[in-house]
């Protein structure tokens, strides 16, 4: 399993330690991320991270884009869609409890370990199904008694869509000065539960 995920934001290097569920920032090292020899020559203390299995993510397309740090808001349910039955809501809530409890207790490592690797295809006729599953999840998510944040919501949405044979990916983005991390879901390279230009605002440190 990958131990570290790395990316850069402006001049900063950001490291995600999956096992310890923590982020680290190394100022002025970001520009050397893709030049390993130069990076380790100038920052020899980073050799520890490169001796383990690691992944290098993508850099924000426009780090000058303003990004308002604010509390994450749960997506509003789509009132134009048919609401799922109470039984389905109950089953969905149990899944959310399971995902959020494990994320709260076991951290990022559990997400990587439990990630399913099946290859699935996406077609445009699945857009209605995606909208419906987002709406259904939003209806019950406020009842979650465990960790409720963008990571939990996005991971739950990814797993729900995967179970419907949709190749959804959890994406984790970061920025620095001040530090901020955020999670969203993409299908076919498109953001489905957040602003479409998230990759312009944040550097992607992990895709699951």
Swiss-Prot record:
Any one biological process term the GO annotation gives: antibiotic biosynthetic process
Predominant cellular place of this UniProt entry's protein: cytoplasm
Cellular location(s): Cytoplasm
Pfam family, any one: Transglut_core3
Keywords on record: Antibiotic biosynthesis, Cytoplasm, Plasmid
InterPro entries: McjB-like (IPR053521), McjB_C (IPR032708)
Superkingdom, natural source: Bacteria
GO cellular component, one term: cytoplasm
Role: Along with McjC, necessary and sufficient to process the inactive microcin J25 (McjA) precursor into the active peptide.
Record's protein name: Microcin J25-processing protein McjB
Species annotation: Escherichia coli
Gene: mcjB
């Amino acid at each position: 399993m990958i131990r570290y995920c790395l990316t850069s934001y402006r001049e900063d290097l950001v490291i995600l330690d999956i096992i310890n569920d923590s982020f680290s920032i190394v100022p002025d090292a970001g520009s050397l991320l893709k030049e390993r020899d130069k990076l380790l020559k100038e920052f020899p203390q980073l050799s520890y991270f490169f001796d383990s299995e690691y992944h290098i993510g993508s850099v924000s397309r426009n780090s000058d884009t303003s990004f308002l740090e604010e509390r994450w808001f749960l997506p509003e349910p789509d009132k134009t869609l048919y609401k799922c039955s109470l039984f389905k809501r109950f089953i969905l809530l149990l899944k959310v409890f399971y995902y959020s409890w494990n994320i709260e207790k076991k951290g990022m490592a559990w997400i990587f370990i439990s990630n399913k690797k099946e290859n699935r295809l996406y077609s445009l006729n699945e857009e209605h199904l995606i909208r419906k599953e987002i709406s259904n999840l939003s209806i019950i998510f406020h009842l979650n008694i465990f960790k409720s944040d963008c990571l939990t919501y996005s991971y739950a949405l990814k797993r729900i869509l995967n179970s419907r044979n949709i190749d959804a990916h959890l994406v984790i983005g970061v920025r620095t000065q001040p530090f901020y991390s955020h999670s969203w879901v993409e299908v076919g390279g498109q953001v489905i539960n957040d602003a479409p230009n998230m990759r312009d605002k944040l550097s992607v440190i992990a895709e699951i």
